[in-house]
């Protein structure tokens, strides 16, 4: 995997994350920041550029670099979205790269390049919205393979019993056709090298996360 900017690496966390650029205006930074936090457990790191009035050249460079490295874009569509000097350009850049664009409708319908896209309702609980976004990224043809890499890597880096259980559940949600041999091997190795995965129980002590993960990958169809 090519080296990417450190803007995509969450603090105190390591490994591979799916890179989602979230285009929004500065008035909605708090809501988008909450969404960013809710996406992290799903293996998604959101870059949340905002509508600075007079951004410095350095800040613009960061935005341009993030747009080049993003694997999908979400447009947080509010009434002031079109008034921004930057948001439409960010969406246009993603469309030009043929990335998946997710319109998140707060109070503005998709328009322009994404006018024909089906919007997701953003006026719901942030955790629910994050789960819905992650579900789309896991299954859409443009994103399901890089998303699988991120989900498997989250499992490999499970740092507690709860995270091991949650990450196991996300493994189970991956489509069968994204399981490249090296992803299968990464899961298999984690079951013997990560003590949290080895010792976390599931089903009221009836099994362990490691055992269930092995059962999952052994049930996958062959190449």
Regions found by a protein language model. Give the residues of each.
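Cross-kingdom TIR/SEFIR domain
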Residues: 36-147, 194
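Residue-level signal for short, function-critical loop segments
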Residues: 24-26, 78-79
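Short catalytic-loop micro-motif centered on adjacent basic/acidic residues
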Residues: 21-23, 48-49
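C-terminal interaction surface of TIR/SEFIR-family domains
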Residues: 1-20, 26-31, 108-223
């Amino acid at each position: 995997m090519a080296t990417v900017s450190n803007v995509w690496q969450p603090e105190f966390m390591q490994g591979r994350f799916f890179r989602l650029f979230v285009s929004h205006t500065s008035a909605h930074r708090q809501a988008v920041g909450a969404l960013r936090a809710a996406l992290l457990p799903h293996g998604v790191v959101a870059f949340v550029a905002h509508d600075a009035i007079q951004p410095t050249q350095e800040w613009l460079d960061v935005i341009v670099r993030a747009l080049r490295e993003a694997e999908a874009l979400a447009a947080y569509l509010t009434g002031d979205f079109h008034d921004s000097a930057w948001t439409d350009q960010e969406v246009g850049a993603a469309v030009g790269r043929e990335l998946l664009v997710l319109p998140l409708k707060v109070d503005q319908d998709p328009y322009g390049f994404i006018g024909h896209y089906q919007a997701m309702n953003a006026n719901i609980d942030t955790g629910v919205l994050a789960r819905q976004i992650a579900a789309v990224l896991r299954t859409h043809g443009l994103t399901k393979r890089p998303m699988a890499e991120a989900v498997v890597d989250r499992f490999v880096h499970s740092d507690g019993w709860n995270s091991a259980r949650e990450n196991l559940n996300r493994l189970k949600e991956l489509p069968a056709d994204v399981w490249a041999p090296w992803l299968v091997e990464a899961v298999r190795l984690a079951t013997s090298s990560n003590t949290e995965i080895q010792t976390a129980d599931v089903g009221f002590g009836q099994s362990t996360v490691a055992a269930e993960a092995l059962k999952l990958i052994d049930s996958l169809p062959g190449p």
